């Protein structure tokens, strides 16, 4: 069946119906959350997946906390009204650090967040120097510093905040080449260190999409650590033990907040990830 772009007022034409499966929402401001979704799908292939990305307010890294909380709650509410959810994953470090309490208070299904994988990185490092590569918002937030104090207080933590890397990851998914020179410029503070980090935390869900390019630029032997696999395991446990019985037989679907030409260009990418349709989601507020 041909895949169609859908407007928010147009009924979605589902693919051939299947057995009802638990409905899981994966949400991000952009397409970086696809890296987390891919880990979850690898572990749990037989779920009904919804991917929602906020291409109206992207990127979140420079937005205020109050704006992010209100926006994320509104989007998850809009999805829940269309498809009752068994579980939601906020696959955005910036949104997770500020919006999880509000989401968990409002909804009765489990909500999983993404936090920088500082704890495993502190265990893996051999030279005691850990790099945290994230958005500027994540680097600045007190939550991140609390994680470091709790799990990596014996390590030297070198933090780099970059909005440009988010844009590079988005461009890669649109089919553009990633400039290694741009990555070298972003990573210059580490590359100039006499002893750079031997373990780097990818503290934004966009950054695993750049793993291949990062390994070409960082010193040989550098370990890259992200939280995708841990999120997948947590999702599996919650679905088994705490999630409500919210299922759908529909095909996987992706939602954007505005049907722009750039969003339409993502359709082939979303298809490769298993999403049958891309539809504009009507969000109040």
From Swiss-Prot:
InterPro entries: Asp/Glu/hydantoin_racemase, Asp/Glu_race, Asp/Glu_racemase_AS_1, Asp/Glu_racemase_AS_2, Glu_race
Origin: domain of life: Bacteria
Record's keyword annotation contains Isomerase: yes
Catalytic residues in the record: 92, 204
Record Pfam families: Asp_Glu_race
Pathway given in the UniProt record: Cell wall biogenesis; peptidoglycan biosynthesis
Key words, A-Z: Cell shape, Cell wall biogenesis/degradation, Isomerase, Peptidoglycan synthesis
Organism whose genome encodes this protein: Escherichia coli O157:H7
Biological process according to GO: cell wall organization; peptidoglycan biosynthetic process; regulation of cell shape
Protein name: Glutamate racemase
Residues annotated for substrate binding in this entry: 28-29, 60-61, 93-94, 205-206
PROSITE patterns: ASP_GLU_RACEMASE_1, ASP_GLU_RACEMASE_2
Its job: Provides the (R)-glutamate required for cell wall biosynthesis.
Reaction it catalyzes: L-glutamate = D-glutamate
